[in-house]
Structure formats: C-alpha cells, structure tokens
UniProtKB/Swiss-Prot annotation:
The gene is glyA. Its EC number is 2.1.2.1. NCBIfam families: PRK00011.1 (NF000586). This is Serine hydroxymethyltransferase. Homodimer. The modification N6-(pyridoxal phosphate)lysine is found at K226. Keywords: Amino-acid biosynthesis, Cytoplasm, One-carbon metabolism, Pyridoxal phosphate, Transferase. Disulfide bonds: none annotated. Belongs to the SHMT family. Pfam families: SHMT.
Length: 421
C-alpha cells in the first residue's frame, strides 16, 4: 500500500500520490504522526468499510455481523492484554470522541473538570473554552511551574480549593514523565475522579518505557496512532464495571452510531504488533532518540523547555533561542523537507497560530530506524540561526537552501519508510 495508486478519480489520485511522495521525502518530526505498517493500511482499505453494525460484539442491531464481531472482539482482547485492564471500548472514532464519552461517564451535566492549560501542554478537550469540554462543563486549569514541569503541590492546592468532579492528566505537549500515583492521591483528597488521556504516550506505556495509569486513573483514554503506530481512532479503558457500562452507553448510542470496522481492524493489527517483542525495542528507541535529539540542541545553547525530555517529544523556545516565531520556523523547515509544528510553550505571549515554540517528536522517524539525530539537530539549528539569510533572494542563500534540502533528501533515501514491523 506504500505505493502510487491508480484511481478513476484522477483528482484524488493525484492528491494521494503527492502525499505519498511527501511522506517518503520528508523528515517527519510532528509528534502526533507515525507510519503504520502495510497490514494496517490494507485492513483500512478492506471490505470491512462496507459493513454496518450498531451495538457491540455479539449483540448488534444488524444481522450478519459475525465477521466484524470477531475483529472487534480481538481488538478489545488485545488492548486489554497490553494495558492489563478489565474493560476496553475500541469504537471511538477519535481521541476527542473518546474523551467526550469518558468525561460524560464520570462527570454530571455542568460538572467541574480540571485540566492542564493549552499553553502548558494540555489538549483542547481537557476544558478549553471553545471545546465541548469547556462549553458543557465548568472548566478550570492548572499550569506547569517556571521550570516547565508539573508542580504537584500547586495542583493539589487548586484541586482542594476548586473541588472538581474530574481531574485530567495526560497531555499533547508535555515532555516529562507523569506521576499518576500523585494525581490519584490529589483526586482522592478532593473527592474527584481521575482521567488519564495517554494519547501521546500510549505506545511508550505499551512498550514499558513510561509508567502506566492503570490502578490510578478511574478511566483512561487514548488515540491509536501517534506512538501506538496504528489506525487513527480512539479507545477507552477502565477497571471499574459501573464506569464501563456508562462508557459503552455514551459511545453508543450517546455520541456515535455504527462503528468504523475497517478502522477497528487497523487498530486490532496495531495492537498485535504492539504485543510483539520488537515493539518494546521500538518504544525504548523512541525515548533514547528523543534524549539524544534534545541534548544535541542543549549543547548548542538552545532553550529546550523543562531542560530535556523523558518521552517522545521535545519543545524548543525559538523566540528566546533564535529570536523567531514558531510559525517562521515551521515555514522554513518545510522548504528543506523537514516537517515540524509550531507550538505554544509555557507562559507563551504569542497567539496559537504564531507561537514562541516548536514541538519535535521522534516516533515517526524511529519507525524508519533513523539514527542521524545529532546531524539533524545541526541542520535545524543552523537553519533557524540563519533564517534571515536563508530567506533572502541571494544566490548564496538559494544554494545553501538547496544544499540543506539535499542533505535531508539523502537521509530519507538512507532511512526509507518500512512496510512491516
């Protein structure tokens, strides 16, 4: 499936094949992206996309569901095995839907939820005012400390003062380990439920390189792509039977109708891959590579938020390090075939579409067995330090940009996208 497609619809064919070319020729550093196996792609393009079946395995509202029942049940069983949980729902179309259903399962209408602010690395669905979580619930936030790390004492003070119904931990731009035990202690002190959104770190947990929230969080949500390297979608897990029943009702019929069986098949295959011994090595390499990458920038005097990383991502303050914006960094690096994303950083004074920071992740390129992290850091650092020159129209600048791009292209030839894991 990692090949050019031939379709009757030439417009869509061109877009898909152009995207395949882009993925093949670009260094992918967006922390939420990865390369799935050929098997996952095949499953998602299978005849399962034709089948409808509301409800859950072996209790559907439609007939002839025996084959999709098998697929969904094996996905459930594998996810339960990976995370060592008693209950799993693999139907959510996305992480956001999973969060919506999970929150509704443990928080009353209009109840109070408490999550990390966007600038500190939280997610829209953790209480941001324009998200469902900030519209239908009374949301409050906590922040990271001046050092860029979670301040558990400050979080406890806020929780005791505000008495939320739910505390959310697990983030989209936080580079350090999360102490789920401390969060549960805080939740118990203020009478709150604890939800862990492990969308970014699920693969690291599966590989044993990040602590698990199981045994601490009342309910756990995740996506199945990112470090999990599977089909795009969401899942919800818990060990609480009553919460499990509510989750099932909120997923269907609460938020969704028929499941996307082709996507669930892609999830099932990714879970199979995550159960193989090689996945542990993959997870270990993600973190090892992120630490090497981070240290390479630190050695060059670059401000890495929190002073480093414990997981798959790092945040760089490009405003203080290079006197540029995240938007400017993202736009230029794309010219030399490096994909990153601008990202707000703690205490950011710039708007979200501009930002003072960038976010870099190692999950995707680790899937390609990429090893030139220090050299890549050198290219990025040089580019951002010399942005004014490189964006000029001089022949010297054009030649240098071409040279940088060719170096990146050589990386992509040396480390191609793999089809099997």
């Amino acid at each position: 499936m990692y090949k050019n497609l031939k379709l009757n619809d030439k417009y869509v064919q061109k877009a898909i094949n152009s995207e395949f070319k882009r993925q093949r020729n670009f260094i992918e550093l967006i922390a939420s992206e990865n390369y799935v196996s050929d098997d996952v792609l095949k499953a998602q393009g299978s005849v399962l996309t034709n089948k409808y079946g509301e409800g859950y395995p072996y209790r559907r509202y439609y007939g002839s569901c025996e084959n999709v029942d098998m697929v969904e049940q094996v996905a459930i069983d594998r996810l339960k095995e990976i995370f060592k949980v008693n209950y799993a729902n693999v139907q959510p179309y996305s992480g956001s839907v999973a969060n919506a259903a999970a929150i509704a399962s443990v928080v009353p209408n209009g109840g109070k939820i408490m999550g990390l602010s966007l600038k500190s690395g939280g997610h829209l669905t953790h209480g941001y005012k324009i998200s469902f979580s900030g519209i239908f619930y009374n949301s409050i936030t906590y922040e990271v400390g001046k050092n860029g790390k979670l301040d558990y004492e400050e979080i406890k003070k806020i929780a005791l003062a505000e008495k939320p119904d739910l505390i959310i931990c697990g983030y989209s731009a936080y580079p350090r380990l999360i102490d789920f035990k401390k969060f549960r202690e805080i939740a118990d002190l203020c009478g709150a439920k604890l939800m862990a959104d492990v969308a970014h770190i699920a693969g690291l947990i599966a590989g044993g390189v990040h602590p698990s929230p199981v045994g601490y969080a009342h309910v756990i949500t995740s996506t199945t792509h990112k470090t999990f390297r599977g089909a795009r979608g969401g899942v919800i897990m818990t060990n609480d039977e009553e919460i499990a029943k509510k989750v099932d009702r909120w997923v269907f019929p609460g938020y969704q109708g028929g499941p996307l069986f082709h996507a669930i098949a892609g999830k099932a295959i990714a879970f199979y891959e995550a159960l193989q011994p090689s996945f542990k090595t993959y997870a270990e390499n993600i973190v090892k590579n992120a630490k090497v990458f981070s240290e390479a920038f630190i050695k060059k005097g670059v401000e890495v938020v929190s002073g480093g990383t414990d997981n798959h991502l790092l945040l760089i303050n490009v405003k203080s390090s290079y006197n540029i914006t995240g938007k400017e960094a993202e736009n230029f690096l794309e010219k030399i075939n490096i994909t990153i994303n601008k990202n707000s950083i703690p205490f950011d004074e710039l708007p979200p579409l501009v930002t003072s920071g960038i976010r870099l992740g190692t999950a995707a390129m680790t899937s390609r067995n990429f090893t030139k992290w220090e050299e890549l850091a050198e290219i990025i650092d040089y580019s951002l330090r010399n942005l004014e020159f490189l964006n000029s129209k001089s022949k010297a600048a054009r030649d240098k940009v071409k040279e940088l791009k060719n170096r990146v292209l050589s990386f992509n030839k040396e480390f191609p996208i793999l089809k099997k894991y």
